[in-house]
Regions:
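Short cysteine-rich clusters marking metal-coordination/redox-active sites
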Residues: 3-6, 24-27, 68-71, 91
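Short metal-binding segments enriched for Cys and/or His
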Residues: 29-46, 95-111
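Short Cys/His-rich "knuckle" micro-motifs
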Residues: 13-16, 34-37, 78-81, 101-102
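Secreted/processed peptides and extracellular or luminal domains of membrane proteins
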Residues: 9-12, 30-33, 74-77, 97
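The feature marks the first
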Residues: 1-22
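Short, solvent-exposed interaction modules
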Residues: 51-100
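Short amphipathic alpha-helical linker/capping segments at the junctions of internal repeats
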Residues: 44-57, 108-123
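Non-ligating segments of multi-cofactor redox enzymes
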Residues: 5, 9, 96, 102, ...
Length: 124
């Protein structure tokens, strides 16, 4: 599979015995098949799959038109409802893509995230 952001090679990374995600060997973005990100979010030490540089991830997050690596359709850019500063790409049929550093941020909702929501309010 090819990375939807930098067209690098996606390599399989295994968490535990039965969960495999795809991580780009170049930009370290991560592809999660449908449901995998939500499952891994609750697992101990699952952030190890997110080994990329968050600063590099911020640069790749600026890319707007991103195609699903499974079907080639344009993915939606979605803000996490609990942490509105996190934007990821999602294909309703196949999964979601996080830039380097985003999954770790997605996993850990901090006090600062809750404060941001109070200040900025919820998106409609």
């Amino acid at each position: 599979m090819e990375c939807p952001k930098c067209q690098g090679n996606m390599e399989e990374v295994t968490y535990g015995r039965n969960m495999t995600v795809d991580r780009c060997s170049n930009c370290k973005g991560i592809w999660f098949d449908v449901g995998e990100a939500e499952v891994l979010k609750g697992k101990w030490m699952s952030e190890f799959v997110d080994s990329g540089d968050p600063e590099m991830g911020k640069e790749f997050n600026k890319i707007v038109d991103v195609d699903c690596p499974r079907c080639g359709k344009k993915m939606d850019k979605i803000a996490d409802p609990k942490q509105s500063h996190i934007w990821y790409e999602a294909c309703q049929e196949h999964g979601m893509y996080f830039d380097a550093g985003e999954f770790t941020d997605y996993k850990y909702e901090t006090l600062l995230d809750k404060f941001r929501d109070l200040i900025t309010g919820k998106r409609s």
